[in-house]
Swiss-Prot record:
Induction: Induced by HBR1 in response to hemoglobin and growth signals. It is found in: Nucleus. The keyword Nucleus applies. Forms a heterodimer with A1. Keywords: DNA-binding, Homeobox, Nucleus, Repressor, Transcription, Transcription regulation. This is Mating-type-like protein ALPHA2. GO terms for cellular component: nucleus. Mating type proteins are sequence specific DNA-binding proteins that act as master switches in yeast differentiation by controlling gene expression in a cell type-specific fashion. Transcriptional corepressor that acts in conjunction with A1 to repress transcription both of homozygote-specific genes and of genes necessary for the white-opaque switch, a prerequisite for mating.
Length: 186
């Protein structure tokens, strides 16, 4: 392995490590990942300027590109989930406030008038927030179920069915073949 190949292999390993970290741990240090990726970009830029790439180097560059795409998508998804959670808790705090606007209750009444089989975004945020908080043991106790019923305005059976379906969805989540290949190479 030439020096470029060794450096590219190391970059690929580091990106794969970040992907595994994000896949396995709900909490990670985004600043650490950002700093590492920026350092890797600088290293790759200098390697590309040398213009002495072997076939092995080109293959490693393709793998790094694939890892970068996966890492990018995972980061975007995490950011979206985080923003949804922040928005949910901000809205919840505002609605719990004694100074909350009466327009909020009008919106909720409008939600009831629409005969839709799907849950509203607010209901999904509440339920998903509860599920993420209780992911280690996603079985609601009676008081938690009652709290979810009050905050979502759903029936007991709807709440219980949603939690049951969400547990099943979590259990059946499969890793895509592309991601599995990347995780196995690391």
């Amino acid at each position: 392995m030439n020096s470029h190949s060794e450096a590219l292999f190391e970059i690929n390993q580091r990106l794969s490590s970040h992907i595994r970290t994000m896949s396995n741990f709900p909490v990670f240090d985004p600043q650490k990942i950002t700093n590492d990726v920026e350092a890797n970009i600088k290293r790759m830029t200098s390697i590309l300027k040398s213009k002495r790439l072997t076939r092995e180097d080109e293959d490693l560059m393709k793998m790094i590109n694939d890892c970068s795409k996966v890492l990018h998508e995972m980061l975007l998804e995490r950011i979206m989930l985080q923003q949804d959670s922040i928005q949910f808790f901000t809205e919840k705090e505002a609605s719990d406030s004694p100074f909350s606007n009466s327009a909020d209750t009008i919106d909720e009444d409008d939600d009831k008038k629409i005969k839709s089989r799907r849950l509203t975004k607010k209901q999904l945020l509440v339920l998903e927030g509860w599920f993420q908080k209780h992911k280690n043991h996603p079985y609601s106790q009676k008081d938690q179920t009652n709290l979810l019923i009050k905050s979502t305005k759903l029936s007991k059976s709807q709440v219980q069915n949603w939690i049951s379906n969400r547990r099943r969805k979590e259990k059946n989540t499969k890793v895509s073949p592309e991601l599995a290949a990347l995780l196995l190479t690391g």
